[in-house]
């Protein structure tokens, strides 16, 4: 029992240090460079067969330290059903993005869509998922709140993690409840090993 507790604390500390390291690394890149890298990466996603085929997609409305998705979401919301996650308590709920004019500032100062909760999870064909870091096995390091670890098991969707190249690592600490991605992409291309579903 004591060993399990020590291992859990060690894992928590490793993840905390890794998040700090990635934040420091991000400071070495200008906003213009990150914007350009976001565009390059999202162009690859647009050309991905899973994206082309999908009609309903789980996306995210980016924070300043994430691959920038605002223009991408706006571009595609009229031809595909784009769902955005909303923080509600300690979970994420989903809402349909219908345009900039239907957004409001919610938890953590994040803009989020207004409207009803989307619950038809079987309709979602693709998830485009952010992360602090990803590794070659598709493991994801989030912000530490477990939001996506709770949401993703409810969905039966193919998930693509997206991040900047400096966030793509050989290996990150992962626990059994951490949800891995089917694919991981950076501005330089696919990062993780090929293991198609």
Which sequence ranges carry the predicted segments?
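N-terminal active-site beta-alpha-beta segment that forms phosphate/nucleotide-binding
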Residues: 2, 6-122
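Surface-exposed, charge/polar-rich loops and edge strands
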Residues: 3, 11-13, 27-28, 113, ...
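Short linear sequence motifs
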Residues: 44, 140-141
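Receiver (REC) domain switch-region micro-motif
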Residues: 57, 127-128
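Glycine-rich, N-terminal phosphate-binding loop of Rossmann-like dinucleotide-binding domains
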Residues: 61, 131, 188
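Short, solvent-exposed loop/turn segments at secondary-structure junctions
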Residues: 64, 89, 133-134, 167
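Short secondary-structure transition/capping segments
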Residues: 103-107, 130-140
């Amino acid at each position: 029992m004591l060993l399990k507790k020590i291992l859990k604390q060690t894992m928590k500390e490793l993840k905390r240090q890794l998040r700090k390291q990635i934040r420091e690394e991000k400071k070495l890149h200008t906003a213009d460079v990150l914007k350009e890298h976001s565009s390059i990466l999202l162009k690859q996603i647009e050309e991905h067969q899973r994206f082309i085929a999908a009609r309903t997609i789980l996306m995210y409305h980016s924070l300043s330290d994430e691959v920038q998705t605002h223009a991408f979401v706006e571009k595609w919301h009229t031809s595909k059903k784009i769902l955005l996650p909303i923080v509600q308590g300690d979970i994420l709920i989903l809402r349909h993005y219908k345009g900039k004019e239907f957004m409001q500032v919610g938890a953590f100062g994040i803009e989020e869509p207004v409207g009803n909760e989307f619950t038809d999870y079987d309709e979602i064909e693709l998830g485009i998922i952010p992360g602090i870091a990803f590794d070659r096995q598709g493991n994801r390091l989030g912000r530490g709140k477990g939001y996506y670890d709770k949401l993703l098991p409810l969905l039966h969707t193919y998930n693509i993690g997206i991040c900047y190249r400096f966030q793509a690592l050989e290996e990150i600490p992962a626990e059994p409840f951490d949800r891995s991605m089917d694919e991981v992409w950076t501005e330089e291309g696919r990062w993780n090993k090929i293991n198609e579903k």
